Amino acid sequence: MRRSLTAGLALVLIAGAAGLWLTRPVKSDPELFAGLTGEASRGERIFWAGGCASCHAAPDASGEARLVLSGGERLTTDFGTFVVPNISPDPDHGIGGWTVADLDSALRHGTSPERSHYYPSFPYTSYAHVEPQDVADLKAFLDTLPPSDRADEPHDLAFPFNQRIILGGWKLLAGGPSWIVEGDLAPEEERGRYLVEGLGHCGECHTPRNGLGLRDKSRWLAGGPNPEGRGTIPNITPAKLDWSAGDIAEYLSSGFTPDYDSAGGQMADVVRNTSQLPDEDRRAIAAYLKRVPAIE
């Protein structure tokens, strides 16, 4: 009996240790960036494609003030309220002291410099696709922006969601980066996939989620309840979005639909970002969206 109990306890300990190892916060290897030099001019393109200002600018900021990434926006969800952090280059209150590898750890692994899990209100499951050179370029651009000394505020989450240790299990369930739309894609469509599935993180809102907040990838971009709890997000697969590729590209540039309506709500902010992109990126997004499987 004693040997059975000892063996059982050993198995429990081994299983627990394995679970902790599998769900540990993962950081990027600094060697990944050896020989890479970030260029701010390229990083600005990554900045707008990634929609950084949409969350990290101060609430209601406009114009040049959107480049002060002081945070403070409150995201209300079924899990509680998340307060967006300061990612300005301030060394004390922002990310001015981060290395490129620190930024990559956050973007692609959802891990802080202190090796703790970030909540997936930060869309690192999409940013996991971002290329190392783009991370280096983004860091170079972020370092040129105005600093803010606004201190971060804690999230307002109820138990058990206020326990970051559970996020390792959530990440394990979410899986690693894999492309949704595969097959023989033209270079323009591949670029669009990178922008939509990766940097632009369109699936974070336009794809429905289950009770754990995991995206239902079988209904990719088919719309669903707003993750922030207000209204619904539309289906942008070809089953519902019947615009031409040119119409889509124009909407991402001007915000005007083929029916001369205009983008509103959260999409108005998205268009403020996509309007800063070069024409070829907007055309690439449109080309990709025409290749997405139609889902009713």
Swiss-Prot record:
GO terms for cellular component: plasma membrane. Heme c 2 binds at residues 202, 205-206. The keyword Electron transport applies. Disulfide bonds: none annotated. Keywords: Cell membrane, Electron transport, Heme, Iron, Membrane, Metal-binding, Transport. Particularly expressed when cells generate energy via aerobic respiration. This is Diheme cytochrome c-type. It comes from Cereibacter sphaeroides (strain ATCC 17023 / DSM 158 / JCM 6121 / CCUG 31486 / LMG 2827 / NBRC 12203 / NCIMB 8253 / ATH 2.4.1.).
